Amino acid sequence: MVLPRLIPRLSRSAFKVAQANNRVFNAPFRGMASSAGVGSGKIRTVIGAVVDVQFEQDNLPAILNALTIDRGEGNKLVLEVAQHLGENTVRTIAMDGTEGLVRGTSVADTGAPITIPVGRGTLGRIINVCGEPIDERGPIEATKFLPIHADPPTFAEQSTTAEVLETGIKVVDLLAPYARGGKIGLFGGAGVGKTVFIQELINNIAKAHGGFSVFCGVGERTREGNDLYREMKETGVINLEGESKVTLVFGQMNEPPGARARVALTGLTIAEYFRDEEGQDVLLFVDNIFRFTQAGSEVSALLGRIPSAVGYQPTLATDMGALQERITTTQKGSVTSVQAVYVPADDLTDPAPATTFAHLDATTVLSRGISELGIYPAVDPLDSKSRLLDIDVVGQEHYDVASNVQQTLQAYKSLQDIIAILGMDELSEQDKLTVERARKIQRFLSQPFTVAEVFTGIEGRLVSLKDTVRSFKEILDGKHDALPEAAFYMVGGIEEVVAKAEKLAAESK
């Protein structure tokens, strides 16, 4: 029993060596991996998404290898090896439905993990977990292919310098800055502007950094994925005629758990290629990271593992770490991840969100209360946090301005009950001044988005970090106390506030 278990470990190690020597798989290499015919077997058992396949003694496939079943008319079902059961039998997880499979059907070993197309040919396309296009726009034009399972960059390859990734969004850059190569949790309910916020980030990264983005729908509703695709076409993020800025990777809610558990790795592999081979600063969106954990839990149960706390898989921390550790900055480029986080029953101690929080560098909270005020982006300036808001990283001036903005907003929040009961007249002169400045800051945190221009009619603004810090410093110092609140709403820099105030004054005469 020891030898069959040892063989796959050795072959997997050999594959990692080959992968290190030739990180980018081109088409001929990929063809050789599948046509060399490492081995073939026959289906022994089918139980839902789990398929047991029996091989010859010398041809047992390695753990994580992709197996294929020809279903006719060019359709292939992909299986991923999960366990070796003994008696030359492997237990696999199907990446698609297993309806119609029968015992005795022939199964081919590709000799490598699931391998997907990468590079610019994927931009503007929608692909599934196996890298196949699902947008009915023909095959993907790609010359490079990579396996979805890879080791994270070595310590020597990683860049350990904490750098701020400028997004051009004032509230984010000032109060909860994103780390280049960091991981950000995006919290928000339905209808608070999560999709528009994501689209603006994609647009700004393309403009400011020339970088690409990968949107990964893990356990997405098919309708939401379709809506996102249509909105991206309307706003120009996806350009069917020219080069698009984003690749969409979907493992929908109705798909088997195997596909949902692996689709995040597919999206990450595409992002890694842009980072490592093209030196890009890439944005990777994962919606929803909880569904990744949920799918892993389903797979674990199907494989017969004993569950741990709350029914989650015993390998929860390992699975999450394997994904998150690959999201990092290297000497060549970076992958910065924005992950929507669903919190089951609003219980932050649930193992799934609790494991996710351990990896996050920043949290961006979208608030319904702020969106009801008509302030967009509806980012909560007091709830959103970042480990990069540190004097050693952002500098003394930025840190002081951000702290004073938060203190002013917190003071206004604590005075709101008094104002609601007694009115503004009962406040001291200092408190009145604090409230006036806080209301101006609150409105100045709003910003017209380029992707929302078709709805608002206001041209989008991308504000540099330097201008953002200077503008808020001037408001805190009282330089613009004489200007009306309305002038601070939906503008870019402070110069626009002054110009808008003059325009409002002229119109009122």
From Swiss-Prot:
InterPro entries per record: AAA+_ATPase, ATP-synt_VA_C, ATP_synth_F1_bsu, ATPase_a/bsu_AS, ATPase_alpha/beta_chains, ATPase_F1/V1/A1_a/bsu_N, ATPase_F1/V1/A1_a/bsu_N_sf, ATPase_F1/V1/A1_a/bsu_nucl-bd
Binding positions for ATP per the UniProt entry: 189-196
SUPFAM superfamilies found in the cross-reference section: C-terminal domain of alpha and beta subunits of F1 ATP synthase (SSF47917), N-terminal domain of alpha and beta subunits of F1 ATP synthase (SSF50615), P-loop containing nucleoside triphosphate hydrolases (SSF52540)
Cellular localisation: Mitochondrion inner membrane
A GO cellular component entry from the record: mitochondrial inner membrane
Catalytically driven reaction(s): ATP + H2O + 4 H(+)(in) = ADP + phosphate + 5 H(+)(out)
Transit peptide, from-to: 1-32
Required for activity (site feature) positions: 384
Binding partners and assembly: F-type ATP synthases have 2 components, the catalytic core F(1) and the membrane-embedded component F(0), linked together by a central stalk and a peripheral stalk. The central stalk, also called rotor shaft, is often seen as part of F(1). The peripheral stalk is seen as part of F(0). F(0) contains the membrane channel next to the rotor. F-type ATP synthases form dimers but each monomer functions independently in ATP generation.
PANTHER family: ATP SYNTHASE, ATP SYNTHASE SUBUNIT BETA, MITOCHONDRIAL
Protein name: ATP synthase subunit beta, mitochondrial
Organism (species): Yarrowia lipolytica (strain CLIB 122 / E 150)
